[in-house]
């Protein structure tokens, strides 16, 4: 863990501890309750989509963005490390096994990416743990990621593959940018009955629509592609967005989703430290993760949440 988590020490008093000081290896998880980070440190899907090099470094950059934040009272935090496999298909399979294993220990998985092809791996892990549940996937993203995978999987094919394979999954996207998606992709989304919420829609309408979406689901998986945010706030991504979502708006939407108490997994993808400025993107991801963890403590009461969902 010392290789993944480190930082300065103010003191060893409980109220002075930083996050990096309390993270433990998953092997130390002896009882249910807590969160577990897992790194999806591959950029193979992005490179297949003709993106830029660097997202494989995103998982560790997010850890760095989290390290100096205050520890959270009454929350156990573990880490499963990064992937051994870097090829997209092998990485997705390894990641899915780790997600399923995290559930077997009664922990809440938080994925750190890496390409947005993390989605298919996460879905497979969730489905292994919850074989009969109706899954709602909510994606914060400027792009639909619903391209054809006939030739090969990329960072933009996961949702089409999931919807083709599983009739018990529904997909919603918030932060959608019409100018970032072709007409054929929009048509594909319409055919798959995707709930598409454009970035410029009123915040109240977006939150109301997502709450209605969640009501129909047994469990919810949230995935946040960091290019959903405006390039000024999140420059360190593979495909920066012009006129993207305001970060504070994104935080409010995330809070509303977490308050439904149906979220069982969340991940943060497409962070590319090589293109970041003053670590803005990785720090923003860190703040969103911190927000998530605080909500988990407040809303889920970790000792019971997993058994209730199962």
Where are these regions (language model features)?
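Conserved alpha-helical scaffold segments that buttress catalytic/binding sites
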Residues: 2-310
């Amino acid at each position: 863990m010392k290789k993944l988590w480190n930082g300065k020490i103010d003191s060893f008093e409980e109220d002075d501890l930083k996050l990096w000081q309390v993270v433990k290896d998953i092997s130390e998880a002896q009882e249910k309750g807590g969160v577990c980070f897992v790194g999806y440190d591959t950029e193979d899907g992005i490179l297949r989509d003709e993106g830029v090099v660097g997202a494989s470094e995103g998982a560790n950059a997010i850890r760095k963005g989290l390290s100096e934040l205050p520890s959270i009272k009454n929350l156990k935090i573990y880490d499963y490390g990064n992937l051994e496999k870097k090829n997209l298909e092998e990485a997705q399979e390894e990641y899915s096994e780790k997600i399923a294993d995290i559930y077997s220990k009664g922990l809440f998985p938080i994925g750190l990416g890496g390409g947005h092809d993390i989605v298919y791996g996460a879905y497979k892990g969730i489905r292994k743990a919850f074989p009969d549940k109706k899954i709602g996937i909510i994606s914060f993203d400027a792009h639909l990621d619903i391209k054809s995978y006939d030739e090969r999987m990329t960072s933009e094919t996961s949702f089409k593959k999931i919807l083709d394979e599983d009739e018990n999954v529904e997909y919603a996207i918030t932060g959608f940018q019409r100018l970032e998606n072709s007409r054929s992709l929009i048509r594909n989304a319409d055919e798959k009955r995707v709930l598409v919420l454009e970035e410029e829609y009123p915040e109240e309408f977006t939150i109301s629509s997502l709450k209605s979406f969640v009501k129909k689901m047994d469990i919810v998986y949230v995935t946040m592609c960091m290019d959903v945010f405006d390039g000024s706030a999140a420059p360190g991504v593979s495909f920066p967005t012009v006129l993207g979502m305001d970060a504070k708006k994104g935080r409010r939407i995330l809070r509303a989703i977490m308050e439904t108490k149906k979220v069982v997994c969340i991940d943060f993808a497409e962070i590319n430290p090589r293109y970041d400025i003053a670590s803005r993107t990785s720090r923003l991801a860190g703040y969103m993760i911190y927000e998530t963890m605080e909500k988990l403590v407040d809303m889920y009461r970790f000792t019971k949440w997993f058994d209730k969902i199962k």
